[in-house]
């Protein structure tokens, strides 16, 4: 490993010890904001520090094995050769892990996220597929013990959704789901199709990180147009009696957010503002990314929401992830929320892209 990388890792090791000492300081414990910030930093350093310590130990074992190989005792020499081979492999594995751990972190990866699913081409079948995708992500969230909260729905006439927006809360949510943004295409025979012909429909998925209140960009109230209207859909006697639904338009960007799933206008407004903040932040982030990465290839996280990223072929039981040329014949399990078989390779591909970019720098 390069000396510059070793020096960086040694610096992180020192910082980890400093943070650990600070966390036991009474004045820090009394300052909850500082204590939380340091606790978060300690948590972020934990993996790289543990891996670097394992690397240091493997290096020591490797040097010891080399010395033992000079011994005259044949049995001892054979043991040393085995140890030499094992530690050499361990060092290579740990070096690769450390390279990944040292990659720049997306500050949003640990955030909660909003997921927006919209039916595209395909009419009723697209809306039904949007419902299937929402169920898939809901099942995935359940498997991770994340919380999912529906923010707004616009139901299809024959089932599913023309649009559904939900908030998913939990550990590392955005980091796992951010590569789901893009065009999702389905090929299957609709239930209403009497000739048995395969139809193609599409949905767009957008995943946005929730912006923590402390980091939220300031939205000028004068830039907002707020409309109230009566909620539609299920809800018993309450429906259509009060203007509880909210529509907020951000005039400078033209972004419009609606929320009507809560009975309280106050709650709908709060939810709409949190979605609006996430969308405005996403626009700002996209501008910055475009400027920074105009000359850099970034296959997975290009963020082009119109780009077709995945095809779900029901007759063949196939899922094809086009960005990494991955095809799997396990559609049923996938639609039941078992999507890590695609989520993890996408994360790994992004890491490989980042490593390649660092190598070119």
UniProtKB/Swiss-Prot annotation:
The gene is prfA. It comes from the Bacteria. Residues 285-305 are annotated as: Disordered. PANTHER family: LD18447P. SUPFAM superfamilies: Release factor. Its main location: cytoplasm. This is Peptide chain release factor 1. Peptide chain release factor 1 directs the termination of translation in response to the peptide chain termination codons UAG and UAA. One of its GO terms (cellular component) is cytoplasm.
